[in-house]
Amino acid sequence: MESGLNNGSIAYPKRLIFLTGCINPDGMAQTKLQNPSLRREQYINSIKFYLDNYNLPILFVENSNSDILEFLPVDIDHRRIELLTFDGNNFDKSLGKGYGEMGIIDHAIRHSHFFNNSDFIFKITGRHQVLNFASVLKQAEKRVSVDIIVDMWNMFSYADSRCWGASRRFIEEVFIHFWKDVDDSRGYNFEDALAKSIYKGLQLDYKLELMKNTPRFKGSSGTENKGFDHSWTSWFPRNAIHVLKYILNRR
């Protein structure tokens, strides 16, 4: 079943917040947070956070065929949000949730009005609220020629997939082609695919910008079902080191 909200009746800004979701993991490997009701509540809170704090269109794509519309506030601004849900979680669960998330992005490429009318997309794990997302937006506004904004670790071998931005062209022409490589059972996850696609993009002259500030996440890890420490005292020293590394890398 395909369901959605918003048929493209408004003008599309060039930037888009894209939230990925899976309300019912249905026994997904390496996913301790399995409770659909709790997951749905977290997705709703996240959607409300971005609607209330950022004047950008929001795309939410969910792959377990679990409709979320009836749970959203009745006064939600439907012109700014597109909701898509589809039956995309029926694959070998040993492949892992990253494989499913790749399928979500592929579904957006093929079916989303918002996605296909945007130039630059910020992909965020749907249950996570990035409390300092304004800093990511500001960086993107200053680096308009950049194709990818991402946080990379371990000598650039690992890319943080919870919050990253990329041009639609990079996502469609490079990134999505790494989908079928994702397989948690052999140790190749979404983050590996993202890092490899970035290296491929650099070879094709796509432009990379490392994220200046470390994202300050509010929410919990689906893998471990543990909450993030989003307190200022925890985030600030980590971010100071992160900004210093960013400055040194640009020299």
Regions of interest found by a model, annotated:
Residues M1-R251:
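ER/Golgi luminal nucleotide-sugar-dependent glycosyltransferases, focusing on the catalytic module
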